[in-house]
Amino acid sequence: MRIAVICFCLLGMAYALPVKHADSGSSEEKQLYHKHPDALATWLNPDPSQKQNLLTPQNAMSSEEKDDLKQETLPSKSIESHDHMDDIDEDEDDDHVDNRDSNESDDADHPDDSHHSDESHQSDESDEVTVYPTEDAATTVFTEVVPTVETYDGRGDSVAYRLKRSKSKMFHVSNAQYPGASEEDLSSHVDSEDLDDTPRAIPVAQHLNVPSDWDSQEKDSHDVSQVDDHSVETQSHEQARQYKREANDNSVEHSHSIDSQESSKVSQESQSREFRSHEDKLAIEPKSEEDEEHRQLRVSHELDSTSSEIN
């Protein structure tokens, strides 16, 4: 409905806009100049009587402008009528909701006339759906009554308070559940209900004190999960330690291999040095023997020469 009203308002505003006529003053002036040259010549004279004779076509145009002004005023009335219709529709919607609430309250107060009221409401709802398809049906939410367990801790004499509480409750409900019953009957009924309720508290306490199988299973699973987590942690620590040990062993072996290689190199160098020194010694010894032989020959030759001189 609001969209339709907005569309109508826009259309009314479009129709209300003034239409500009083609400016044909130049052609009219030319026609007047050809037809009435004397009148145009006298237009410059300040005689008001002659000017009124020439202003007759402008007066004719003023009537058209009046019609345009009348057309401009009409859409405002239509807009006001649309606003008035919107107000009427809103009032009808409010009345419809109030009537529906009153009908629901009447149904709750008078359940015996359900058939007649249902038929009338069904017919009304069918008519309302056809008239107002956009409205949502009013639904009532019913909450279920959940029984609660009352505790009597910190109330002095719990047994007496419980008896008073139960009796007051039963006296409040007596008119609705047991019409025409006396107070003695109600008190006996309360006592019987108290006696019936007393053994029911023992199994509840037993169930609360005794752990269920499900709780035990949950505890076992929790313990097993903790043990598994602990075992996983220990395994991870052991693996880390083994990795460290292997790394240390590898480093030690590598260092030993490097040391052995260095020692072998040193031993080879020492052996090569000894071999070279032995070869040098062997080369020096034959030279010394040759020198001694030369010396002996010289000595013997000198002795022979001296002996020959002496002779």
UniProtKB/Swiss-Prot annotation:
Pfam families associated with the record: Osteopontin (PF00865)
Job of this protein: Major non-collagenous bone protein that binds tightly to hydroxyapatite. Appears to form an integral part of the mineralized matrix. Probably important to cell-matrix interaction.
Residue stretches of biased makeup (Acidic residues): 86-96
Residues bearing PTM Phosphoserine: 24, 26-27, 62-63, 76, 78, 81, 105, 114, 117, 120, 123, 126, 188, 192, 212, 216, 221, 225, 231, 236, 251, 255, 260, 264, 267, 272, 277, 288, 300, 305, 307-308
Biased composition (Basic and acidic residues): 28-38, 111-124, 216-259, 271-304
Cell attachment site (motif): residue ranges: 155-157
GO terms under biological process: biomineral tissue development; cell adhesion; osteoblast differentiation; positive regulation of bone resorption
Coiled coil: none
Protein name: Osteopontin
Subunit description: Interacts (via N-terminus) with integrin ITGA9:ITGB1.
Residues listed as glycosylation sites in the UniProt record: T130, T134, T139, T143, T148, S231, S305
Region (Disordered): 28-138, 167-311
Location(s), subcellular: Secreted
Skewed-composition ranges (Low complexity): 260-270
Key word Cell cycle present: no
Entry keyword set: Biomineralization, Cell adhesion, Cytokine, Glycoprotein, Phosphoprotein, Proteoglycan, Secreted, Sialic acid, Signal
Signal peptide range: 1-16
Residues annotated with Phosphothreonine modification: T234
Family: Belongs to the osteopontin family.
